[in-house]
């Protein structure tokens, strides 16, 4: 009996998790071939040496209240590499001033009026305080853009100075590009269950008070996880782009950009939505119609190693409100957030949001100049970097717009048997969500192949 073979297209965390889950589920005799044209695996998980220290230049943290990453680390024997944030809190830069991030918010939506005093004007504070007595029209199951709901209930300043900074940091988007069910699912659920105001919904939707840190990371960076997934999955990496996909009577045939053909009993597509559209154009029209409506943003990260004695506040970083003169959308004071470990401090600045071309058009020199200028404007410090690394993420940040879950359901419903999809455009943009979606995809694939 011929052993089965599988092809995974895409070498990010979704593709690598899928390959590993396949290996665990199928054993040693199955061939797993992974296609990724890059010079490295990991996708938007990229660890580089900056100032002699490992530093993640893509995703850098995961929510500890979600179980997927700690569980996977434990399964791989990497639990001792998990580390957590310090107790440093982030700031918001608004009206050319630094403000504390208000406590008890959901995606930046406040749970009290008094907590945002000083960050928004008095009229907005009063509007938020009186919101509970205003009639709320809500249709259960609806999914408005976060900007639409928050502006209507709390005012435009609440959007620009509270919600936009948080969503810009997560999605490289804004409250206008993210739907409520993706950006604040607990708030949407509370409204569905009868909350009579946005304030009440936020209070009901607050996460349980955590006894410890909110975020985790890996000592040595995400490369530690990438390397172990590659080792455990025992995959064959083909550094090529899949350009053709066809289903025959005995499985799938894939064609890469060298002209080579590959056969598979099952296929996992762990690629961004635009590539999904190109690969499935002739195979899955329903999936293509839905995936083509998922748009993405680009961003660039400037990582700096700066002298150890550079004066930064005891905060984890800064989120930038909409309409400010800064070029950066966020600043991460990495050595404050994770603890000072080397002879220098590490800092990250992120540039680019949905709708702009900063990440693809600005030169490295321009990005560095903007980084130094923004640090001076925000912290009143003159920075002379010891080391610099620039990383661009083009079309890497899917925008979870209104109705995104319906699009994802359509993507899955339109797939032919033994072909599954995973990736950051499916069930969440973070690493835990990608791990979960990859596991779900492999479970579905195994059930279909076994029929």
Curated annotation (Swiss-Prot):
Cofactor section: FAD
Cellular component aspect of the GO annotation: cytoplasm
Gene of this entry: cgoX
InterPro entries linked: Amino_oxidase, FAD/NAD-bd_sf, Protoporphyrinogen_oxidase, Zeta_carotene_desat/Oxidored
Known role: Involved in coproporphyrin-dependent heme b biosynthesis. Catalyzes the oxidation of coproporphyrinogen III to coproporphyrin III.
Family designation: Belongs to the protoporphyrinogen/coproporphyrinogen oxidase family. Coproporphyrinogen III oxidase subfamily.
Residues involved in FAD binding: 10-15, 36-37, 58-61, 242, 393, 429-431
Record EC number: 1.3.3.15
Catalytic activity reported: coproporphyrinogen III + 3 O2 = coproporphyrin III + 3 H2O2
GO molecular function: oxygen-dependent protoporphyrinogen oxidase activity
Flavoprotein keyword on record: yes
Keywords: Cytoplasm, FAD, Flavoprotein, Heme biosynthesis, Oxidoreductase
Gene Ontology biological process terms, A to Z: heme biosynthetic process
Free-text cofactor note: Binds 1 FAD per subunit.
Entries under Pfam families matching the protein: Amino_oxidase
Enzyme's top EC category: oxidoreductase
Keyword Oxidoreductase in annotation: yes
Subcellular location: Cytoplasm
Pathway in which the depicted protein is active: Porphyrin-containing compound metabolism; protoheme biosynthesis
UniProt-recorded name of the protein: Coproporphyrinogen III oxidase
């Amino acid at each position: 009996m011929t052993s089965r073979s599988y092809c995974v297209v895409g070498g990010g965390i979704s593709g690598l998790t899928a390959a590993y889950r396949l290996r665990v589920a199928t054993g040693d005799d199955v061939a797993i071939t992974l296609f990724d044209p890059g010079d490295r695996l990991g996708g938007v998980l990229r660890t580089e040496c900056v100032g002699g220290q490992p530093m993640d230049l893509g995703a850098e943290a995961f929510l500890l209240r979600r179980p997927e990453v700690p569980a996977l680390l434990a399964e791989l024997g990497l639990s001792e590499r998990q580390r957590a944030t310090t107790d440093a809190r982030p700031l918001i830069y608004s009206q050319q001033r630094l403000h504390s991030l208000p406590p008890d918010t959901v995606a930046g939506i406040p749970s009290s009026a008094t907590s945002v005093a000083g960050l928004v004007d008095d009229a907005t504070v009063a509007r938020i305080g009186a919101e509970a007595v205003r009639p709320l029209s809500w249709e259960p199951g609806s999914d408005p853009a976060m900007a639409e709901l928050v502006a209507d209930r709390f005012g435009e300043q609440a959007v620009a100075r509270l919600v936009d900074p948080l969503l810009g940091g997560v999605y490289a988007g804004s409250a206008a590009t993210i739907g409520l069910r993706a950006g604040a699912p607990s708030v949407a659920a509370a409204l569905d269950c009868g909350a009579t105001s946005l304030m009440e919904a936020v209070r009901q939707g607050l996460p349980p008070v955590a006894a410890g840190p909110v975020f985790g990371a890996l000592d040595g960076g995400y490369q530690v996880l990438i390397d172990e997934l590659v080792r455990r999955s025992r995959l064959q990496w083909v550094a090529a782009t899949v350009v053709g996909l066809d289903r025959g009577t005995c499985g799938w045939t894939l064609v890469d950009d060298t002209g080579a053909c590959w056969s598979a009993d099952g296929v996992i597509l762990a690629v961004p939505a635009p590539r999904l559209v190109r690969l499935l154009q002739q195979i899955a029209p329903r999936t293509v119609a839905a995936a083509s409506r998922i748009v993405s943003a680009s961003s660039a990260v400037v990582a700096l190693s700066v002298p150890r004695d550079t004066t930064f506040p005891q905060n984890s970083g800064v989120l930038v409100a909409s309409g400010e003169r800064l070029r950066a959308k966020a600043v991460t004071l990495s050595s404050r957030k994770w603890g000072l470990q080397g002879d220098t401090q590490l800092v990250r600045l992120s540039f680019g949001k949905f709708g702009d071309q900063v990440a693809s058009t600005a030169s490295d020199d321009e990005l560095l100049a903007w980084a130094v200028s923004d640090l001076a404007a925000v912290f009143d410090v003159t920075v002379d970097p010891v080391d610099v690394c620039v990383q661009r993420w083009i079309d890497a940040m899917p925008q979870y717009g209104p109705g995104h879950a319906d699009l994802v359901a359509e993507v899955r419903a339109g797939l032919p048997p033994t072909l599954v999809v995973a990736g950051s455009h499916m069930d969440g943009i973070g690493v835990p969500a990608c791990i979960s979606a990859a596991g779900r995809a492999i479970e579905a694939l195994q059930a279909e192949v076994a029929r």
